[in-house]
Amino acid sequence: MAATDLERFSNAEAEPRSLSLGGHVGFDSLPDQLVSKSVTQGFSFNILCVGETGIGKSTLMNTLFNTTFETEEASHHEACVRLRPQTYDLQESNVQLKLTIVDAVGFGDQINKDESYRPIVDYIDAQFENYLQEELKIRRSLFDYHDTRIHVCLYFITPTGHSLKSLDLVTMKKLDSKVNIIPIIAKADTISKSELHKFKIKIMGELVSNGVQIYQFPTDDEAVAEINAVMNAHLPFAVVGSTEEVKVGNKLVRARQYPWGVVQVENENHCDFVKLREMLIRVNMEDLREQTHSRHYELYRRCKLEEMGFQDSDGDSQPFSLQETYEAKRKEFLSELQRKEEEMRQMFVNKVKETELELKEKERELHEKFEHLKRVHQEEKRKVEEKRRELEEETNAFNRRKAAVEALQSQALHATSQQPLRKDKDKKKASGWSSIYSVTIP
């Protein structure tokens, strides 16, 4: 009996019963309540404009919303790509719209364009992170939170008439998983209709072959399925922007005046501006907001929560509570910390051993060098002693010879001084004898 009741309760949870009402209750006014609440709260819509400097991003925004936004003139000498968001409060009838236009200033102006997409990706992720942090707060206030997540990226393509640039393909590939991309051909009045048609086909072919996922207007809603299906075939839109009014016939229209004629912005035979405005604002603005939240933000949120250790439970297993997730992550961090500490300790021990070996090797080298220098010193000392002895012997011999020479010199001087005295004596003796002889012999 208990098993039967359990099965009955399980089936009741899986398949709720449909009941008929006996009279009017009043919850059929829920759509009206939702509309009233939404109108009171207002809406936010955030557009990211990516394209080369001077391609007409600001002009197109002014044309789309039929107003003049205050923007700074951008130069072609930006050192890097920077994102410049500007927020405006718009009102049409009783609907308030907080519009944020984010311009990728300096995109494509650098010589090295390898990392031109990086600031754009970082900005989109930063807005997702801000929203996630608001969601994770204990006291959160999403009702008053200004949602800055990018709802659509209008990617402006230079009208070369040939093919997409490598920078365009790389950037759109990096962005397609983070934002709804609508490619548009800017300044479409600079190429002929035949060239424009071929250019569109070429662009779509390159996007498909390179796996770039652009935003497709939804066809699951019967109310807009037909028009969206038709508009999907016109992508990318070839647009012309202008805030100047030119008189055509008896009325003033927004157009661009050329010597050869007038290009009317809202003439669908001249460009796709009206198609872009209808698809972007009138028909699919809410779907762009919904896709941003349910697809792109959810992907970012899921990756972040998985990094934090959260995961969905399997169908057969019990769901994980926040405490269990916290404890599991805490144990994981502690084990990782212990592993890191052990690695650092082992690294320190190995480093100490290596240092000790190096010190011992240095000590051995210094000892060998000392012994070598000691031997060299002793050898030099021995040689110096030998030289000293030889010098002393030579000095003694020199002194002896000097003494002998001095003795001989003194003897010679003595002998030289005695010889004149003998000569004088001899002379005197001779003269004496001669006088004697002279006396005896007359």
Curated annotation (Swiss-Prot):
Positions bearing Phosphoserine:
10
Q: Which GO terms describe its molecular function?
A: GTP binding
Residues reported to bind GTP: 51-58, 106, 187-195, 241, 256
Q: Which residue spans adopt a coiled-coil conformation according to this UniProt entry?
A: 322-410
Any single GO BP term: regulation of protein stability
Instruction: Tell where it localizes.
Output: Cytoplasm; Cytoplasm, Cytoskeleton; Synapse; Cell projection, Axon
Where is the stretch described as G1 motif?
Answer: 51-58
Region G4 motif, residue ranges: 186-189
The record's annotation in Pfam families points to: Septin (PF00735)
Domain Septin-type G, residue spans:
41-307
**Region (G3 motif): which ranges?**
103-106
Entry's CDD domains?
CDC_Septin (cd01850)
PANTHER family named in the record: SEPTIN
Query: Family per UniProt?
Result: Belongs to the TRAFAC class TrmE-Era-EngA-EngB-Septin-like GTPase superfamily. Septin GTPase family.
| Its biological purpose | Filament-forming cytoskeletal GTPase. May play a role in platelet secretion. Seems to participate in the process of SNARE complex formation in synaptic vesicles.
Its quaternary organisation is: Septins polymerize into heterooligomeric protein complexes that form filaments, and can associate with cellular membranes, actin filaments and microtubules. GTPase activity is required for filament formation. Interacts with CDK14, SEPTIN4, SEPTIN5 and SEPTIN7. Interacts with VAMP2; the interaction inhibits interaction of VAMP2 with SYP. Interacts with STX1A.
- This protein is called Septin-8
Q: Which organism is it from?
A: Callithrix jacchus (White-tufted-ear marmoset)
What gene makes this protein?
SEPTIN8
